[in-house]
């Protein structure tokens, strides 16, 4: 069916060109969006015509109803849909015949005319001129819910955007949230910066990196797992309030909350500590939720999340004692391992850091409203400053919402000797088979030796945050083009079914 459909459309294109009509012209002067037309002329009464008001509009044809010498058709742009009406008496018999033969669902068309409301009260453009702007060679899906395979949606996101208006709004909300974040930080004197994506040494998080090869130097390099260490180098160099929004890459699993390629923001402020960063995190996310959702109490997958400040703050040690009855500072590894086994958790790597991480995962699931888990042990926080009251702990927090880690922040470690020792401990863990442990970064230690002021640092996983504000069940729903298992083009073509009937 698809092959025959394309062949027919190609014949139509040849016919248009033989008539001197270019089916892919260069430009069209679009004056108003669908939303602007509705806002400007919605006051019209049913049957009222405003012939003195000329306007132009362009968009994709989504439906057509032919009635003899007239036709109604719906057009769509990125603000919504608008109806148009065309008749032979207005555009001429030749242009009307051309419209009937060659303007199809999926095509882009530009129209000029005036607004009126139909007898049923629908705001409509009365078409006096039209221009074919782009011919579609493929049929649109017959109905959106007819695409059963979500993998097709993720591979061909443009299809979802074409036929599902909610998808457009979902991604608009995501992009608006990014704008809100920038406005919030810029208004507070932060500078947006850029740091490398190709790294000589990975760092800033515990994760397995993607490896690539730089031919000119004949060396392996890594896609960044986090920008943290380069951002702190900028603090060493003299910047005081900086942030970076960008992509990170971790060569790990895919799940409803994990993507190998994801977007984060990292924020660093000299002369601040983790208490300041907690306040900043709360204020920033409250602003994002308020401006994108209009309320601080939102529905997510049938449950309410209340972002109203102040948010709860809980010490990790106390939390795990209360929920699991273990003391992550005093109990030996055997006790922690036994507790995990009681909960059916299996571990490949059984060092203390992994034991504590898995225990934490067990109890965080129950936290729905935003909650700061604070004061993590040193063994799981190689880049955080030791706690001022207990050197076994660090001044670190994680923000948990709906059982998911959304943010991670520290009073940054700025003691080069302590940092070097932590790297040595991480290197030992790597030698024992922990591929996610930090690599030794001697240049970063060297940078710290020049002196870094007291600094608060914060990282937020933006995709997970955007899942909440768009009520999306999986992270792939908020990433425009997520990573999916590839299929051969021919296999994808075979999966395509149907099209609008014309």
UniProtKB/Swiss-Prot annotation:
SUPFAM superfamilies: Class II aaRS and biotin synthetases, Nucleic acid-binding proteins. Binds 3 Mg(2+) ions per subunit. It holds the Pfam family tRNA-synt_2. Mg(2+) 1 binds at residues 398, 405. Mg(2+) 2 binds at residue 405. It catalyses: tRNA(Lys) + L-lysine + ATP = L-lysyl-tRNA(Lys) + AMP + diphosphate. This is Lysine--tRNA ligase. The gene is lysS.
């Amino acid at each position: 069916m698809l092959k025959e459909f394309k062949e027919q459309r190609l014949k139509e294109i040849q016919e248009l060109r033989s008539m001197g009509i270019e089916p892919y012209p260069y430009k069209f002067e679009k004056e108003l969006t669908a939303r602007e037309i509705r806002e400007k002329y919605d006051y019209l009464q049913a049957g009222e015509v405003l012939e003195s008001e000329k306007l132009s509009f362009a968009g994709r044809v989504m439906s057509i109803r032919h009635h003899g010498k007239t036709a109604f058709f719906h057009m769509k742009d990125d603000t919504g849909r608008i109806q148009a009406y065309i008749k032979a008496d207005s555009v001429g018999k030749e242009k009307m015949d051309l419209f009937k033969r060659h303007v199809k669902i999926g095509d882009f068309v530009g129209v000029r005319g005036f607004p009126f409301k139909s007898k049923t009260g629908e705001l409509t453009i009365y078409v006096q001129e039209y221009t074919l702007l782009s011919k579609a060679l493929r049929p649109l899906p017959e109905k959106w819910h007819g695409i059963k395979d979500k993998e097709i949606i993720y591979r061909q996101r443009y299809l979802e955007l074409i036929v599902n208006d909610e998808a457009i709004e979902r991604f608009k909300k995501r992009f608006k949230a990014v704008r809100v974040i920038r406005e919030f930080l810029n208004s507070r004197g932060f500078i947006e910066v850029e740091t490398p994506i190709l790294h000589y040494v990975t760092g800033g998080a515990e994760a397995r990196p993607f490896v690539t090869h730089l031919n000119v130097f004949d060396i392996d390099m890594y896609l960044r797992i986090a920008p943290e260490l380069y951002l702190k180098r900028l603090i060493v160099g003299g910047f005081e309030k900086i942030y970076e929004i960008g992509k990170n890459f971790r060569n790990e699993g895919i799940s409803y909350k994990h993507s190998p390629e994801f977007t984060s923001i990292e924020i660093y402020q000299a002369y601040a500590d983790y208490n300041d960063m907690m306040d900043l995190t709360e204020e920033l996310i409250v602003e994002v939720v308020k401006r994108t959702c209009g309320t601080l109490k939102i529905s997510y997958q049938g449950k309410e999340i209340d972002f109203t400040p102040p948010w709860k703050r809980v010490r990790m040690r106390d939390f795990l004692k209360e929920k699991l009855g273990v003391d992550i500072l005093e109990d030996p590894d055997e006790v922690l391992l036994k507790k995990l086994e009681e909960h059916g958790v299996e571990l490949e790597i059984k060092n203390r850091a992994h034991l504590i991480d898995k225990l934490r995962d067990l109890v965080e699931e129950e936290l729905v409203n935003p909650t700061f888990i604070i004061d993590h042990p040193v063994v799981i926080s190689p880049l955080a400053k030791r706690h001022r009251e207990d050197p076994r702990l660090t001044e670190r927090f994680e923000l948990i919402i709906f059982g998911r880690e959304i943010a991670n922040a520290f009073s940054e470690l700025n003691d080069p000797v302590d940092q070097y020792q932590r790297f040595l401990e991480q290197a030992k863990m790597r030698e024992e088979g922990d591929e996610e442990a930090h690599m030794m970064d001697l240049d970063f230690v060297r940078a710290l030796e020049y002196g870094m002021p007291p600094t608060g640092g914060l990282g937020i996983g933006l995709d997970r945050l955007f899942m909440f504000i768009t009520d999306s069940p999986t992270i792939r729903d908020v990433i425009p083009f997520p990573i999916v298992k590839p299929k051969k083009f021919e296999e994808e073509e075979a999966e395509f079914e149907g099209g609008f009937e014309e």
